[in-house]
A protein has these predicted regions:
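Rossmann-like dinucleotide/phosphate-binding beta-alpha-beta segment
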Residues: 1-34
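Rossmann-like dinucleotide-binding domain for NAD(H)/NADP(H)
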Residues: 21, 35, 41-127
Length: 127
């Protein structure tokens, strides 16, 4: 919690696991600075959208930028849609849609194929 209390920006880049579901909820938001900006490009379920929308509505945090949501595509009924504006940026799961990201994916794929063909372990192997 000390890290959350001190953070000016909280950028989430974690996998969705049992431990990360709802990681940022009422309790976490309550200890953050009123100026903190939360960025979520991980998985929608990591953030409790109702808790985040309430914190934004009440001005308890400075802002948020989300590229992932619990339900995708985001619908008009999502609580974050009601607070979208100057301090809230919502994008349609497109954070990886840059030329740099696409080139990195291609490069890593080719490197992994070569590694497997040569009997080596692929890069970033998930087991």
């Amino acid at each position: 919690m000390d890290l959350l209390k001190a953070a000016d920006v909280l950028s989430l880049h974690c996998p969705l696991t049992n431990e990360t579901v709802g990681l940022i909820g009422h309790e976490a938001l309550a200890v953050m600075k009123p100026t903190v900006v939360i960025i979520n490009v991980a998985r929608g379920e990591v953030v409790d959208e109702d808790a985040l929308a309430l914190a934004l509505k009440e001005g308890r945090i400075g802002g948020a930028s989300l590229d992932v949501f619990i339900g995708e595509p985001i619908t008009p009924g999502n609580p974050l849609m009601a607070v979208a504006g100057d301090k809230v940026v919502l994008t349609p799961h497109m954070a990886g849609a840059t030329m740099e990201s696409q080139m990195r994916i291609i490069t890593m794929t080719v490197e992994n194929l070569a590694a497997v063909i040569e009997g080596r372990e692929p890069i970033n192997l998930v087991t």
